[in-house]
């Protein structure tokens, strides 16, 4: 957890702790627990991230073991924030009227399969799944992105995903990926 989810702040003695939220989901019980953790360890502040995780700032380095234990007690101690297994997805056809493809279903399966990737270079890749052209998951700036589209197969329009590779996530999204 500490390797993937904790980063040193500029201010000595403090760290940023990312809470990995699989597919951006957490229960109301977990949300209340995170509020208690934030009040206790960060002065009552937290942020959401573009990767659909939560970020605790101003965590004293001395408090990191306690923060981890508190997160573990509610099932929020998953490592892998910002790695290839930390797949971002929009709601897709689950709840969005514009959804063409089931982006959450794809993201869940990718997440399950990519958790075993241990090569350092591959672990740093970003994967994002958008269920339609609106790009809510920002697939176009991911190293590996999926865009929900439809195709005609045997005379019927059916959902598919278009693969997009090579987007630049860092440096203010300096490049869009190329559709394959």
PLM feature spans:
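Peripheral terminal and linker regions in Fe-S/redox and tRNA-modifying enzymes
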Residues: 1-180
